[in-house]
Amino acid sequence: MSIKDITIVIASFKSEKKISQCLKSIHSDYNVINVENSDDQIYKKKIENEFKNVRCILAGKNLGYGKANNIGLKEVKTKYALILNPDAELNPKALGNFLTLAQKTPDFALIGPNVDENKKKTNLHFEESENFLLLKANIVKGYAMFLN
């Protein structure tokens, strides 16, 4: 498996400042689909010009987080998708660690990250733990979810 096996989907709504930091935390070799819940052509041009690996889809209006993610997921052509919030930042090793976990458990449905919320930002990283094979959870934080 390689980085070409993952597409990152980010639903946003007028989040230009936040999403810029998020996109800077993603290596430029990863494909990213940003579904912007507006019709802001200036936003689309700015994001796609600054981040060549990002395809911005304008929803035309605020369809909400779930519907915007579904639009993005329909465009994914890779084996895996990562739904990521526009205010999250990835640890540099996060996606590589995810691929390692995915290889060990190829029939997973969803993998969520370990989260470091001690700072003023949320730092996401994926590591194997004793709870990795957890089959049921009471809550999954939705700011980063890997889907198979």
Where are these regions (language model features)?
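Short aromatic/hydrophobic "clamp" motif used to bind/position activated sugar donors
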Residues: A81
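A conserved acidic beta->alpha catalytic loop
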Residues: S25, E36-K44
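Conserved donor NDP-sugar-binding/catalytic core segment of glycosyltransferases
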Residues: K93-H125
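The conserved acidic donor/metal-binding loop of glycosyltransferases
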Residues: N85-E89
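Short, well-formed alpha-helical segments that are part of the catalytic scaffolds
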Residues: I10-S28
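Short beta-strand/loop segment that forms part of the nucleotide-sugar
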Residues: Y30-D39, I57-A59
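Glycine-rich, basic loop-to-helix element that forms the pyrophosphate-binding segment
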Residues: A59-V76
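A recurrent flexible, glycine/aromatic-enriched loop bordering the glycosyltransferase active site
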Residues: N131-L147
